[in-house]
């Protein structure tokens, strides 16, 4: 099927537009310690691997799967958010090279941009403030009431509705994880692209069904603009 004109780009944050450099894993270590997971050994290794495998998903959903009970999951999530926000306060958050310019270029060419995350809305807002990105995109979205995180399609479909794209065939999505790709495929978007700036590699992204794999968000913007 020939793609229709892209009207909306839905773009992930950590690993896609924001450098990760181990920040998510470091914050997870604090969360695991907070709920009593031994600091070394097979239990810790299994939990760490699960976090790596589920990169891109809603963090509270990851902790529910890991720790079972809601109380432990909420405790772990709160510790994760505190640790990640502390890393932001220490100046550890930085944009991926060219991300600001790529997003601005898309918008200058009439393409709306939504920034999405698996973090809470509070952490997302803090990250945006640290980067000076409060007005960079048309919309920012995080999982919450009535909006499930990845791999569900809710973030993409919510962006489509709020930014009034004509259909999913007018939407392109970009992320660095297999969860991003699964979410985009479930939403039925025209372009479900993976980027090599984050958690998962070319083979993992293609095996997940990515329609395109690009080197960075700069290449993603070029892909969209070349196919208008």
Residue spans for each PLM region:
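Glycine-rich phosphate-binding loop signature in dinucleotide/nucleotide-binding domains
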Residues: 2-4, 108-111, 163-170, 227-228
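N-terminal helical cap/lid subdomain that shapes the substrate entry/recognition surface
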Residues: 3-101, 105
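Substrate-recognition element of Asp-dependent hydrolases with the DxDx(T/V) motif
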Residues: 28, 80, 99-131, 141
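A short, structured active-site edge motif that brings together acidic residues
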Residues: 50-51, 133-149, 170
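Surface-exposed amphipathic alpha-helices with a cationic face
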Residues: 100-108, 160-161, 181-186
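Structural recognition of alpha->loop->beta junctions
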Residues: 132-142, 204-222
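Conserved Lys-Pro-Asp/Glu-containing loop-to-beta segment of HAD-superfamily phosphomonoesterases
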Residues: 150-181, 193
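Acidic, Mg2+-coordinating phosphoryl-transfer loop and its flanking beta/alpha structural elements
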Residues: 172-212
């Amino acid at each position: 099927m020939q793609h229709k004109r892209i009207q909306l780009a839905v773009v992930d944050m950590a690993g896609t537009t924001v450098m990760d450099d181990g920040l998510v894993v470091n914050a997870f270590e604090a969360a695991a310690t907070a709920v009593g997971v031994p600091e070394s050994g097979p239990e810790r290794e299994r939990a760490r691997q699960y976090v790596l495998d589920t990169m891109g998903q809603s963090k509270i959903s990851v902790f529910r799967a890991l720790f079972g009970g809601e109380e432990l999951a909420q405790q772990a999530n709160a510790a994760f958010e505190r640790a990640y926000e502390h890393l932001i306060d220490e100046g550890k958050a930085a944009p991926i090279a060219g991300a600001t310019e790529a997003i601005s270029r898309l918008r200058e060419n009439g393409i709306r941009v939504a920034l999405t995350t698996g973090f809470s809305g509070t952490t997302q807002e803090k990250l945006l403030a640290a980067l000076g990105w409060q007005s960079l995109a048309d919309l920012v979205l995080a999982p919450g009431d009535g909006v499930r995180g990845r791999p569900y399609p809710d973030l993409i479909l919510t962006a489509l509705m709020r930014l009034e794209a004509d259909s999913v065939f007018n939407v392109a999505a970009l992320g660095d994880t297999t969860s991003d790709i699964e979410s985009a495929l479930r939403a039925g978007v025209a372009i479900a692209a993976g980027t090599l700036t984050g958690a998962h590699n070319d083979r993992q992204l293609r095996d997940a069904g990515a329609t395109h794999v690009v080197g960075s968000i700069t290449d993603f913007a070029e892909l969209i603009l070349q196919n208008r």
